[in-house]
């Protein structure tokens, strides 16, 4: 299997792009479904980019910027809801939580029970939802500059509020993960904020779907041993799951 996937990747890299039919012809003893699964795996680890009817080579620098929040909020919403639901049982009444910015964490905030919680968030949309929909919860916004792409606040003022607040559980997001780079973000200021949160939180739960595997963004904010629980989906490669578990990460998977 590994040799076949390596051969597929090499062919796509050499030719720049290839159709599924063209790739199937390279392995006449394998079904088109098998080849499509191989392409899906290669796309998940960032080796190629899927296209309609085939795949193309991964371009240098591709995926190195944050996508717009409004582009992500309606993508894979059912999967994000299943992942967010798996995080809810970890929430206990009268606890202090940090909720990171992101489309999955927004769904988590929507599902959050009204349990007299103290919630700090870097996301203005999450703060607004908590303030208007969870009457027994207190909400604090980190402050700082608002990034229009990610709907996240960071920078000046955010460190001060973090220094004064103890966090029981941080529910984090990540823009990418690779074994070499760890968990990564696309903005330096947001990376600094995430690092501060990790230093204050008793427990860190990270929600990240398997499409982020192999996507290496510019700024590392966490290594595997700093994450207690990863909530992801069944698309996570078994080899990566095993290595995360070896480093002490509990992996919980939603059906993809």
Predicted regions and their residues:
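Conserved phosphate- and dinucleotide-binding cores of soluble alpha/beta proteins
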Residues: 4-6, 10, 18-22, 30, ...
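Short, well-ordered alpha-helical scaffold segments within catalytic/effector domains
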Residues: 80-88, 105, 159, 191
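Short active-site oxyanion
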Residues: 93-97, 114-119, 226-229
């Amino acid at each position: 299997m590994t040799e076949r996937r390596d051969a597929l990747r090499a062919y796509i890299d050499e030719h720049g792009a290839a159709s599924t039919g063209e790739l199937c012809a390279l392995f006449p003893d394998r079904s088109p479904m098998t080849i499509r699964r191989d392409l899906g795996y290669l796309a998940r680890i960032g080796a190629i980019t899927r296209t309609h009817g085939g795949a193309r080579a991964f371009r240098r620098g591709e995926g190195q910027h944050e996508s717009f929040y409004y582009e992500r909020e309606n993508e894979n919403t059912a999967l994000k809801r299943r992942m967010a639901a798996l995080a809810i049982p970890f929430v206990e009444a009268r606890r202090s939580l940090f909720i990171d910015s992101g489309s999955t964490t927004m769904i988590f905030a929507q599902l959050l029970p009204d349990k007299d919680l103290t919630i700090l968030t870097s996301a203005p949309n999450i703060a607004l939802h908590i303030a208007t929909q969870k009457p027994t919860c207190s909400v604090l916004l980190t402050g700082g500059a608002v990034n229009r792409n990610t709907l996240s606040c960071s920078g000046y003022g955010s460190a001060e509020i973090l220094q004064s607040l103890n966090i029981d559980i941080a529910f984090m997001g990540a823009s990418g993960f690779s074994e070499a780079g760890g968990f990564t973000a696309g903005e330096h200021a947001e990376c600094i904020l995430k690092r501060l949160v990790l230093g204050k939180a008793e427990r860190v739960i990270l929600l990240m779907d398997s499409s982020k595997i192999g996507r290496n963004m510019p700024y590392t904010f966490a290594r595997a041993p700093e994450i207690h629980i990863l909530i992801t989906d069944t698309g996570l490669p078994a080899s990566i799951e095993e290595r995360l578990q070896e480093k002490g990460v509990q992996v919980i998977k939603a059906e993809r």
